[in-house]
Amino acid sequence: MQTESSRREAAAATEQLFAANRAQGSVQFDVRAVDGVTRRGKLHESGSLRVRFPSPEQQGLSAVLVNTAGGVAGGDRFSIDIAVGESARLTLTTAAAEKIYRSHGPSAQLDITLKVADDGHLGWLPQETILFDQARVERRIDIELAPRASLLLCESVIFGRSAMGETMRHGRFIDRWRLRVGGKLVFAETVRLDGEIGALLDRPAVAKGGVAVGTALIAPGDSELVERLRENADLFGAEVGITAWNGIAMARFCAQDAARLRADMMAVLRRAAGRALPRLWLS
């Protein structure tokens, strides 16, 4: 019979095993406008997170985040801190979809901080985040915009790879977003799915059986932008809702699979951006 002391020792050994195998990574950099051209400023990378800058483009600088760990597992910690200076333009994506793997221990932690100065623009356009069954992750996204800054941001989450016959039944997904413009909080949201996620997604008021969800934020945004984004809405293959308030526009997406979600998000993002999306989105 296992004693309390032996249980504590087993728990401590398990914790040490998780700690030894946890990945960590951070990326911190800024971009600034120099003679009308956006250039990289200071850059700090550590652990398994890297950023690469493809050839410069006329409409600003492009960046690609790379997780050399190949995915995110329980207890991993990653942080991203990006600052866009006055009149600078940056579009950022990821090299591939981020995979959050099964965890029998602590949740992974993802912390993202984005700052944009006056007349600066940030396109935060990562590819999908895919959660495997029993994945556990907590994400924080904090955004600070100056009064004349602009933002195009999207995030999409896939609960299980349905095309591979996989479903996500249990796990933990906590997603905290905060957006401030000129120091004023204009958007705050925390999504908490914990436990039987598959059953929660089946609820009509949650996802009505959808397993692929996404959010796009556009700032500044108004009713005129909303009407433009709603054009050809009858062609959407997923459930899509678009609205505006507090000087920002938002689009919500919910689909039965990742392919439909991506197609609808790309249609909205192209119209919102007024330009082509990152090439990696097309591969």
UniProtKB/Swiss-Prot annotation:
Tell where it localizes.
Cytoplasm
In the UniProt record, which is one GO cellular component term? Answer: cytoplasm
User: Is rRNA processing among the key words of this record?
Assistant: no
Q: Name one GO molecular function term.
A: nickel cation binding
User: One Pfam family for this entry, by name?
Assistant: UreD
Which keywords belong to this entry?
Chaperone, Cytoplasm, Nickel insertion
Q: Which family does it belong to?
A: Belongs to the UreD family.
Cite the PANTHER family for this sequence: UREASE ACCESSORY PROTEIN D (PTHR33643:SF1)
| Job of this protein | Required for maturation of urease via the functional incorporation of the urease nickel metallocenter.
What quaternary arrangement does the UniProt entry report?
Answer: UreD, UreF and UreG form a complex that acts as a GTP-hydrolysis-dependent molecular chaperone, activating the urease apoprotein by helping to assemble the nickel containing metallocenter of UreC. The UreE protein probably delivers the nickel.
Give the protein's recorded name. Answer: Urease accessory protein UreD
Lineage, please?
Bacteria, Pseudomonadati, Pseudomonadota, Alphaproteobacteria, Hyphomicrobiales
